[in-house]
Amino acid sequence: MMSFRNLTRRTALTLTAVAALSLTGIAGANAADNVKVGVFPVTSALPYFVALERGYFKDVDIDAEMVRLIGGPALVAAMITKDIDVAANLVTIEGMNANLKKPGLVNYISINSQNKQYKMETFVVRKGFDATSIADLKGAKIMSAPGPANIMMAKAVLAANGLKEGDYQLDQLAMPQHVTAMQAGTYDAGYTLEPAVTLMENQGSAKALESGLIATYVLGKDDADAWVAGTALTGEFLKDRPDVAKRFAAAWARALADIAKDNTVRSHLVKNTFTPEAVAPTVPLVNFVMAENLSDGDKAEYQQFIDFVTDSGVLSEKVDVTKYLKTF
């Protein structure tokens, strides 16, 4: 016959085991959802670091895991191979090209505009080179931000200013080399991006000739919005974990709201991106807008930009950009 002492001991052990299993179940139920985010660490990645470091992902039970990637092709490749669920800052041309090859792969929850107010792409000229406008670059040796899209845009802007191929030399150059190339005088001018422009001007090695080039020369107005990049979720993420995707978008929207009204967000650039501390307080930022807040006019300008790219031969066929804007 089992003694009272043994019965009590066995009961206690059983209750302990049940309690442990219950706690494990609770912990599992409350575990944050992991979301892998591909991040190209430049200024346009700012919303990710604001949402992460201000606890906005944590507030919606998301464990955001950064996958550092350099450039659009790397981000798209990681989306295809399911190594990331989200691309924090993917060029829209790259996104639409990916959707032509694999429809529904890239879905933007927010997009970023740039123009003369929200500066990004800029033609610069080195110190000592005689040019006061883009039209003065005939005979110049010009560097460009890398990739087919940037080369196409540089040529389009030069053509709009009366310069045809053969009137200049154009070489694509990795972005980290732009500032030193201007300092060394390796190139006379450049189609470059922020924060390189601000760095060059602060150093005195180059000056800006004109910024907001896509808005002016592609969309036809200085104050137009060129929707050139944005934050995209994979179609599989949206299909398989719609609630997590919705919570991610909510955290992202909070970060965008902070960027619009709180200049202290710039502190997140210094330790997380290629932006040096000296220029973080003044470097221009693009205009971050959630897809749900886009007006009909915004969508029309977005379509106009992508149509221009298609007509230029970079995309193989027309794309309806609204198909790949995701709202919740």
What are these regions (language model features)?
Residues D59, N115-K116, I214-A224, F288-K299:
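Short, solvent-exposed loop/beta-turn-alpha elements that line the ligand-binding surface or hinge
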Residues D33-N161, Q169-Q172, D188-E194:
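Short, glycine-/small- and polar/acidic-enriched structural segments
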Residues L46, V106, Q114-F123, A206-K207, ...:
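Small-molecule pocket liners
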Residues L21-A29:
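C-terminal segment of classical bacterial N-terminal signal peptides
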Residues V91-I93, K102, Q177-V270:
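Pocket-lining segment of extracytoplasmic ligand-binding domains
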Residues M2-L15:
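Bacterial N-terminal signal peptides that target proteins for export
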Residues I306-F328:
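C-terminal solvent-exposed extensions
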Residues L238-V314:
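Secondary-structure end/capping motifs
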